[in-house]
Amino acid sequence: MTMIFGIPVQALMGQLLVGLINGSFYALLSLGLAVIFGLLRVINFAHGAQYMLGAFTALLLLTMGGVNYWLALILAPLIVGLFGAIIERTMLSRLYKLDHLYGLLFTFGLALAIEGTFRYFYGASGMPYAAPGALTGAVNLGFMFLPIYRGWVVIASLIVCLGVWFLIEKTKLGAYLRAATENPTLVQSFGVNVPLLLTLTYALGAGLAAFAGVLAAPVYQVSPLMGSNLIIIVFAVVVVGGMGSILGAIVTGYLLGVVEGLTKVFYPEASNIVIFVIMAIVLILRPAGLFGKDA
């Protein structure tokens, strides 16, 4: 049996894969948080609930409408994004000129309301969501079997993350979004509808959370608690990467997922706290985060 640092290669590669899977969800969710905070200056505590909404929307589309996984992967983010747009336009937009604490408290209350509603109707136990037939099975890599769906999760999340990064950082629309945050009056003078841009930004963040939820549905059971169990870790990832940093959210999400996975191999007792230990160290040495800009 091949060993690496005294660990069987199958066990090492298996945990590396688990780390990449978790990192894919960390990256997608952190990216949504970074987009919302970086462009709206809102700490969106409802992000975990929107992730859960994505998974439940996919499940309900399947059970009530017979909508398959591939269509749900498109429809669920659009539905949750529309829900986010309504929330932003009708309620959240009224808090922009107030202290950040008000936005945090509002989104925290919204998360509790959404989670409580789903717990009332569906209970706290998880419900299965089957992966599509085309993504079932595994590929023999020689040293391990790679579940096809797990590989799809990593690839899909990477494509979406890079696509959003390109949209925000390299396109004219992204330039308008960034400028609208810094100087909305100037952007409006060019005939740009700034309130609409802000609404679309929040919808994008909510849609990213929902997309992650649909990807997660076949990996984990669909549960009202799935978002609240993950959101604290995701906030830690965002802090390490730098609040509002798009690239930082993506890179740090994957990196910390891998670190967490490898920690389960070499020091399992620390696997549940390693991300928070890294966050504490980063806050001490570089408070703005690894990719954040110093104030």
Describe every region a protein language model picked out.
Residues 94-170, 197-200, 221, 262, ...:
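Transmembrane helix-bundle core of multi-pass membrane transporters
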Residues 66-110, 117, 251-256, 286-287:
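Alpha-helical transmembrane segments within multi-pass membrane transporters and channels
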